[in-house]
């Protein structure tokens, strides 16, 4: 540990992301990436963007992209905030809306970046314990003193919370911001975007990494009433005015516009998810109902860690969490149909040998 580090640096426990192997032969089902490439229109936009004007700074307000997203969701561009991936948007949101002396509430089994942000900003937080079936008890979020964060669908479980439940949480916290993290909403859930008009305290955060196949370009955004977005811009412009580069912005615009390609790819992921669930059930796995591009699975006979290790030996990566209550579960991203057929073949052979 360096003597030059600040106390925060010494004490923080950083987020640990999923393994990113260099071997292209590995079937990668561990970080919830889209198995399909970006829209051809996105790739063409990237090629066209390689021009002389790359020497100039990009638009700090991302006006063209904000207008595109606003039109898509029937909002004004003043209700859209752009960031360098939804992780940055989340980090800025924690700093914008939550106070150190007030307790923020989020689930004990959820995106593990939340406690990292809270500790980084010295926020007090409470972990709301999820039920045994991994559903959320909305009463745990009632009158949160500092605000609340809901992942919907939840990660790593894939469990979806109804809009009526989201409404109740918003109504129970009218004086505090409720962040709804919708990284996986396009794989079967109904977005809380439709609540923005009636609820000034809701901030919806989405990403183009999952359903739009742009994880490599880092584009996230927040949607909310103008006062919330204005606050986010104040914090963003105190860190870095130019969060999105010119090429990423142009690629994102085309990704949003190509609705036909988006629907085709998400439909294939959902279809493959359902097929995989059925196949796993045939060999005794239990699967938590999922509205995401991944599934959360367990088996009464076999240990999740053993299966995880054996799959890795077979060049198939899934995600294992050595944490209380979920240490016998695996999170499996939904790949292409061909990848999931290989996954099924490998996992059948593994459990037959265990």
Swiss-Prot record:
This is Histidinol-phosphate aminotransferase. Its EC number is 2.6.1.9. Its cofactor is pyridoxal 5'-phosphate. Homodimer. Gene3D superfamilies: Aspartate Aminotransferase, domain 1 (3.90.1150.10), Type I PLP-dependent aspartate aminotransferase-like (Major domain) (3.40.640.10). It is an enzyme of class 2 (transferase). The modification N6-(pyridoxal phosphate)lysine is found at residue 210. The keyword DNA repair does not apply. Pathway: Amino-acid biosynthesis; L-histidine biosynthesis; L-histidine from 5-phospho-alpha-D-ribose 1-diphosphate: step 7/9. One of its GO terms (biological process) is L-histidine biosynthetic process. The lineage of its organism: Bacteria, Bacillati, Bacillota, Clostridia, Eubacteriales. It comes from Clostridium botulinum (strain Okra / Type B1). GO terms for molecular function: histidinol-phosphate transaminase activity; pyridoxal phosphate binding. It comes from the Bacteria. InterPro entries: Aminotrans_II_pyridoxalP_BS, Aminotransferase_I/II_large, HisP_aminotrans, HistidinolP_aminotransfase, PyrdxlP-dep_Trfase, PyrdxlP-dep_Trfase_major, PyrdxlP-dep_Trfase_small. Keywords: Amino-acid biosynthesis, Aminotransferase, Histidine biosynthesis, Pyridoxal phosphate, Transferase. Coiled coil: none annotated. Belongs to the class-II pyridoxal-phosphate-dependent aminotransferase family. Histidinol-phosphate aminotransferase subfamily. It catalyses: L-histidinol phosphate + 2-oxoglutarate = 3-(imidazol-4-yl)-2-oxopropyl phosphate + L-glutamate.
